């Protein structure tokens, strides 16, 4: 066997014997590297005659190509074997149950606000917002609330240090200031709802220092009590999803509406369990009335031309009634177990076409 044939056999045997990719790389360097055996033989051609150098060069180039092809073929085999070993070691049992996915839940307050907006949007209302810190004028005076009214007392209202001009400031006790700001800034007709946070100095099972309200305001020409009743009736039946839900209006008093009425819905309390529907008993859910002429005048509107109605309710209260939540304070305790129980599926926005809650 010639030296070239012996070299060919040795190099190919080393390639085929490589058990893994690092060993194959060592075989490649030993054959084709700068100090490899083929490279060394090419360096020895300087002592040959031109004819011999040409013949030996062709032989070594052919050997170089053959070894390179053998290396690539062996590399492909080794990669497949390595992949097969990895797949065997990392095998997944597809019959095992999947890992539980952590999924957030929509808070009942957020869900209830979305439901309210969906209902009133279908009646042409838009959403209006205002600041939580209000002036005495927007929170009390413009709403025809006299200075001696109990709502202005320190034990009911959170007062803040006066503004730079000395004007009294409070944490708003209702979202009615949004109605005042809207009437001052926009021209009638007006049809808005104003959901948001409100603040009162109270804390027990049915009261918290901060809670949410939504109020509605409609201003236009020839608006009357019939429009108010029809709007509330449609809302109550859509929200509680009871088509024949009875709704009752009881005369009441609010400084900012005249006439004023408390709104009750039908219910049952048999066996200590509250059920919404036509069951012979009544439950109050909101206050309402025709906007007081003095309030219209305070906002620069002529009561002889413009009339309107307004109503408002506590968002937590109607959420508790609809979803059977017994304690108002739990809305704000950040208990994930409570939220998992009473929360709602994310991205499932309520609408009247598919149903408010699913």
UniProtKB/Swiss-Prot annotation:
Principal subcellular localization: cytoplasm
Note on how the cofactor is bound: Binds 2 magnesium ions per tetramer.
EC number(s) given by UniProt: 6.1.1.20
GO cellular component, one term: cytoplasm
Keywords recorded for this protein, A-Z: Aminoacyl-tRNA synthetase, ATP-binding, Cytoplasm, Ligase, Magnesium, Metal-binding, Nucleotide-binding, Protein biosynthesis
SUPFAM superfamilies: Class II aaRS and biotin synthetases (SSF55681), tRNA-binding arm (SSF46589)
Binding site for Mg(2+): 258
Reactions accelerated catalytically: tRNA(Phe) + L-phenylalanine + ATP = L-phenylalanyl-tRNA(Phe) + AMP + diphosphate + H(+)
GO molecular function annotation: ATP binding; magnesium ion binding; phenylalanine-tRNA ligase activity; tRNA binding
Cofactor(s) in the UniProt record: Mg(2+)
Annotated compartments: Cytoplasm
Any GO BP: phenylalanyl-tRNA aminoacylation
One Pfam family linked to the record: Phe_tRNA-synt_N
Assembly and oligomerization: Tetramer of two alpha and two beta subunits.
Protein family according to the UniProt entry: Belongs to the class-II aminoacyl-tRNA synthetase family. Phe-tRNA synthetase alpha subunit type 1 subfamily.
Name assigned to this protein: Phenylalanine--tRNA ligase alpha subunit
Taxonomic source organism: Rhodospirillum centenum (strain ATCC 51521 / SW)
Gene: pheS
């Amino acid at each position: 066997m010639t030296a070239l044939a012996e070299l060919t056999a040795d190099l190919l045997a080393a390639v085929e014997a490589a058990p893994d990719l690092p060993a194959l790389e060592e075989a490649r360097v030993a054959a084709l590297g700068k100090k490899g055996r083929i490279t060394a033989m090419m360096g020895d051609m300087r002592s040959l005659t031109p004819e011999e150098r040409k013949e030996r060069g062709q032989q070594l180039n052919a050997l170089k190509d053959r070894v390179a092809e053998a290396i690539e073929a062996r590399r492909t085999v080794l990669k497949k074997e390595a992949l097969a070993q990895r797949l065997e070691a990392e095998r997944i049992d597809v019959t095992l149950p999947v890992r539980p996915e952590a999924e957030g839940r929509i808070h009942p307050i957020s869900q209830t606000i979305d439901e309210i907006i969906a209902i009133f949007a279908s009646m042409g209302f838009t959403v209006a917002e205002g600041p939580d810190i209000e002036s005495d004028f927007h929170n009390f005076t413009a709403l025809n609330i006299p200075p001696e009214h109990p709502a202005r007392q320190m034990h009911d209202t959170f007062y803040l240090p006066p503004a730079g001009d000395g004007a009294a400031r409070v944490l708003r006790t209702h979202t009615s200031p949004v109605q005042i700001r809207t009437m001052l800034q926009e021209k009638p007709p007006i049809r808005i709802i104003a959901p948001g946070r409100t603040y009162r100095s109270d804390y027990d099972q049915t009261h918290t220092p901060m809670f949410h309200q939504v109020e509605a305001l409609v201003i236009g020409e020839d608006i009357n009590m019939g429009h108010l009743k029809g709007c509330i009736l449609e809302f109550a039946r859509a929200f509680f999803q009871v088509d024949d839900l009875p709704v009752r209006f009881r005369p009441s008093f609010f400084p900012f509406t005249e006439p004023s009425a408390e709104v009750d819905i039908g219910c049952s309390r048999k066996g200590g369990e509250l059920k919404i529907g036509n069951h012979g008993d009544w439950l109050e859910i909101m206050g309402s009335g025709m906007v007081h002429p003095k309030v219209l005048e305070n906002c620069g509107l002529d009561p002889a031309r413009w009339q309107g109605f307004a109503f408002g309710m506590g968002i937590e209260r109607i959420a508790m009634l609809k979803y059977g939540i017994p304690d108002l304070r739990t809305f704000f305790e950040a208990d994930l177990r409570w939220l998992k129980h009473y929360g709602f599926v994310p991205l499932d926005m309520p609408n009247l076409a598919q149903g408010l809650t699913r």
